[in-house]
C-alpha cells in the first residue's frame, strides 16, 4: 500500500488502521502518518541514505520505539567509527615509527614490514558502516507583527457548505481546522487567502497561485498588516511550471525580491532542495513541491500562514522541521489537517461539524461524520 491514508479524513484513517490490524495477510505499507504507523505497524523498515547507495534497516518493533532505537543505532555507528579511527591512527603511527628506525637500524626492517602488513590488512577490512545520511531540513519562518485581531468572522456562511458562524483569531494563535472531507474547510482557507470578504490593500495574498473564488455571506475580515499565504493541498502553481528552482528564486516576483544564485543555493540547501536546484518545478516529488511552497512563503513575508493538509506529502524529517518552524514563527497559523500527530502542536481547534455547524473545541475532535447534504 503506497500512502493509502493520503486524502483520508480521520474516520477513514481509523477504518484503515482497524483493517490493517485485523488482517492476517502480510502488509507492506508506505506511510508518513505517524499516528497511523503508531497504531498499525508492527515493524518499521526505514530506507537510509548513504554515499555508496541506500540501504534498508528494519526495526523489529513498532513506531513508538522507532525514533529512540534509530538514535541509539546511529550513536553506536559513531562510536564504532571513533574507535576505528583511533586504532587506524595507532597502527599508522607505529608503522611510521618503525620506518624511521629501520632507516638507521637494519634489525628493525622486519618489524617495519610487519607493521606495514598490519596496517594494510586493517585498511583493507575497511571502516565500520558509516552513519546513514540524515536530512537536515531547516524551515526558518519569520513572519512579523500584525494587529491583535488577525481574523474576525461574523455570521460567515460558506454557501451550500456550512451554517453561519462567528470566530475571533488573535495574533500568534495556532488554529487547527478539523472536520470530515467535504465539510468546507479548504473553502474557508481560500476565502481568507483572497483577503477575506472585503479585501484591503494591506491584506494582499503573498501567493501567486490562482485562488478560486468562494461563495459566502457574512464577514471574514483580516487585521492590520495581516498578509495571508496559502499552501494548497494540490501544490498547483501554473506560473511555476517549466521553471527551475534556481530560476524561481533568482527572478523573484511581485511579493519577494530575487536573489543571487549563491544565496538561492544556500536557502535551497536548508530545505534539502539543493540537489534539485536545476530541476523544473513540475518534475519535483510531492514532498519537494511542498517544501518549496513553504520556502516561498518564508521569502514573501506572510504573517498569516494558511496550510491545507501541509504534512500530506512530507516525510517524517520534513514534518518535524515544519513543526519546529511553526513553533518559531512570529505570526498566526491556521491549518486544515487530518494529521493527529501534527495537531498536537496547536492550541485552538475549529471544528466543522457533521450537522453543518462550526464550533471551537478545547482539544482535537476527530469523530465528526460526513455532512449530510440535500441532493
Segments (PLM) and residue ranges:
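ABC ATP-binding cassette signature C-motif
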Residues: 1-77, 139, 145-375
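Flexible nucleotide-interacting loop at or near the entrance of a catalytic core
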Residues: 73-164
Amino acid at each position: 500500500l503506497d500512502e493509502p491514508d493520503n486524502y483520508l479524513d480521520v474516520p477513514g484513517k481509523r477504518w484503515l488502521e482497524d483493517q490493517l490490524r485485523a488482517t492476517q495477510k502480510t502488509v507492506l505499507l508506505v506511510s508518513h502518518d505517524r499516528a497511523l504507523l503508531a497504531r498499525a505497524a508492527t515493524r518499521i523498515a526505514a530506507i537510509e541514505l548513504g554515499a555508496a547507495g541506500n540501504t534498508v534497516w528494519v526495526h523489529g518493533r513498532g513506531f513508538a520505539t522507532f525514533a529512540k532505537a534509530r538514535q541509539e543505532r546511529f550513536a553506536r555507528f559513531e562510536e564504532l567509527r571513533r574507535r576505528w579511527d583511533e586504532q587506524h591512527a595507532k597502527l599508522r603511527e607505529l608503522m611510521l615509527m618503525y620506518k624511521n628506525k629501520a632507516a638507521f637500524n637494519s634489525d628493525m626492517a622486519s618489524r617495519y614490514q610487519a607493521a606495514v602488513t598490519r596496517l594494510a590488512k586493517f585498511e583493507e577490512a575497511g571502516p565500520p558502516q558509516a552513519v546513514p545520511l540524515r536530512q537536515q531540513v531547516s524551515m526558518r519562518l519569520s513572519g512579523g507583527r500584525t494587529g491583535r485581531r488577525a481574523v474576525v468572522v461574523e455570521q460567515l456562511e460558506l454557501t451550500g457548505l456550512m451554517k453561519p458562524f462567528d470566530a475571533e483569531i488573535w495574533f500568534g494563535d495556532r488554529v487547527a481546522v478539523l472536520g470530515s472531507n467535504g465539510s468546507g474547510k479548504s473553502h474557508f482557507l481560500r476565502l481568507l487567502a483572497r483577503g477575506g470578504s472585503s479585501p484591503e490593500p494591506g491584506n494582499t495574498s503573498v501567493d501567486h497561485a490562482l485562488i478560486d473564488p468562494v461563495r459566502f455571506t457574512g464577514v471574514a475580515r483580516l487585521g492590520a498588516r495581516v498578509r495571508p499565504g496559502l499552501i494548497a493541498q494540490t501544490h498547483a502553481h501554473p506560473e511555476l511550471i517549466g521553471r527551475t528552482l534556481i530560476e524561481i528564486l533568482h527572478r523573484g516576483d511581485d511579493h519577494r525580491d530575487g536573489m543571487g544564485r549563491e544565496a538561492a543555493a544556500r536557502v535551497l540547501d536548508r530545505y534539502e532542495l539543493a540537489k534539485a536546484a536545476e530541476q523544473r518545478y513540475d518534475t519535483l516529488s510531492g514532498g519537494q513541491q511542498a517544501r518549496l511552497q513553504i520556502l516561498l512563503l518564508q521569502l514573501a513575508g506572510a504573517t498569516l500562514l494558511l496550510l491545507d493538509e501541509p504534512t500530506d506529502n512530507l516525510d517524517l524529517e520534513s514534518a518535524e522541521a515544519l513543526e519546529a518552524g511553526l513553533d518559531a514563527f512570529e505570526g498566526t497559523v491556521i491549518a486544515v489537517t487530518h494529521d493527529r500527530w501534527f495537531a498536537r502542536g496547536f492550541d485552538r481547534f475549529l471544528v466543522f461539524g457533521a450537522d453543518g455547524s462550526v464550533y471551537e473545541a478545547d482539544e482535537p475532535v476527530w469523530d465528526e461524520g460526513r455532512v449530510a447534504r440535500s441532493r
